[in-house]
């Protein structure tokens, strides 16, 4: 499980899929929904342009395989797609009389045929916009699911002079990021401030952790305590290259100033790229920071603790999951299993309430140490699987802030006929107590938010020790 366009691209590559469908007669809708797509068969070929046939395949793939595909009102997806199509026509100044939504009856196949006929009449009149209209239409259909683990991944390109480990963007991270920007923006809280400077334009401009961002391109990041869309401009994705103007405040000096940052490729600190980092606190506490549930990450955490345990008696473990965007639920389960056996860590449920049970891997050796887990709104997906299990099963204490609430369910991938990837969950996630975590998050046992002053000094706020 993962969230954001970059994360989506990583998920698509990790979970390569294959999906095929025969070309149906134009007078009929697609074959039965269940035959629209299939599970992975191999890596994708070269991507080609999206077409109405690709949109059709995705539509029936969703109806046949998505969590609520069998019960949802498919008209809502077609409506979302048509809204996006007409808005794009307006943006290009090319609106046409025929761009009216056809009548829909609730018959999924008949409705698709009506939609397709209207779509073709429109796009035949603006052939130079055909590719763009297909993209916005399919993006809107997928977004119409309202599911933070449903996405269509396409047009993923590396910028020139980009190498593994490099970054692209403005070169800094703020306290509102990742899942809060893309998956659950209602969770963001003011003030907006820099938490890490990674390189690039931000480093060249002299930004520092703790600097408060008062405006972005002239727009405030919060209105009446609610996040505004302006925050998304802090995280451009290639090929987005428009400069971003920030108004900043450094509280330690009272200085206010403005900078303009241009997105670009930058080298990142190699240490910051490590998935697992560890150190000893107070001569007896193992501190381990885990940035994502990558393959083999649980074993790497165990090895880090074992190294710190050599030659001394540990009194506890602090596992820092702040900013952990998720990854493999298998790794999350293995990590939980080092703190408890014979437990249910989660349920994965279909729309009719039939649930599969996720249990601890009792082949994992118990650490036998008290546990404190540091969480924040950047802890998403598999990170929330782990955190909810720790809290519900009383395996340790959560300290920090509530998690992201971006954990609808583990996504399954499908490769569409133009070699782009469609991903969404077939089941939705519930915590060990059968509670919904998605859009809500996991509350901490001790609420200890990070402040601009904490970020500026590089010190964590006081939190309970194991």
Regions found by a protein language model. Name each.
Residues 1-8:
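Bacterial N-terminal signal peptides that target proteins for export
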